Amino acid sequence: GDGNEGSRVRFSAPAKVGENVRSAAEEAHAGDVVMHAGEVVAPAGAGLLASAGYASGKAHATPRVGIISLGTELVAPSNVPARGQIRDSNSSALMAEALDAGAEPVFYGIAPDDEQTIAELVHRAVLECDFVITSGGASAGDYDYVTALVRREGEVLFDRISMRPGKAITFGLLGGKPYLGLSGNPAAAYVGFEMLARPAIRKMRGFAEGARPVQQATLTHGVKKRQHRRFFDRATVLRDSETGELLVTEAKTQNSALLG
């Protein structure tokens, strides 16, 4: 029929009892936990919460992470370096890492080796952000004005860590905010962020998991540990087409200035 009153419907098969009927408490019962703390509320999760009567809820705010590059020798990535200069690659990498960790990165620029300029940028970042990260000025022989500033106005909790790359790392509190001073070497800055900043940001966001997942793999050749510290080596990872096993080949050079 045309669907109007008086039309007839013909069924091709008998209906089953309960078919196409949604029972009460089919998805969750009273008292059930529909979402755990630390879970990300994705679209499906938002619908699930709404079905349980939660139109809104408490969530962790996105932390703002202030990033400052230190060094008179640094120029913006778009500039052509003059003799004795180098492009600032750390700011781009750290901003991408902060975003990936769940933060809102804020770049405060490149600070030359000038105590007043560095202090002004750091103070501004502390006022406007929840976490401040600098790269450069942390190795022996560098102008380490930031650590001196943190010692003077805040508290330095440690300024070395037993790992490589990234041994020269400063962590402390300034204005009640966490401060992390990373090495200027790109690989060292990357490892320092992954090991220390990423878990901290994830914790600030309220995520249940802080670190990246760990997978087991097999080395394609022997690797000798050179010192009594934790090493993070660059390597390539391939999956064996026959066995499905993950195979790891260490890079020929582990220079902390290299990322590739």
Predicted regions and their residues:
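Structured core elements
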Residues: 10, 34-35, 66, 107, ...
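Phosphate-binding chemistry for phosphorylated carbohydrates and sugar-nucleotides
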Residues: 31, 187-189, 220
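Glycine-rich, charged/polar anion/phosphate-binding loops
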Residues: 19-21, 49-56, 167, 205, ...
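C-terminal terminal segments
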Residues: 11, 23, 86, 209-260
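Solvent-exposed alpha-helices and their adjacent loops that cap or buttress functional pockets
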Residues: 2-4, 25-28, 41, 56-61, ...
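Short glycine/threonine-rich loop/turn motifs
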Residues: 85, 91-93, 100-214, 226
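Short, glycine/charged-enriched hinge/interface segments at domain edges or termini
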Residues: 1-112
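Short, acidic Gly/Pro/Ser/Thr-rich loop/turn segments
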Residues: 18, 42-43, 72-76, 187, ...
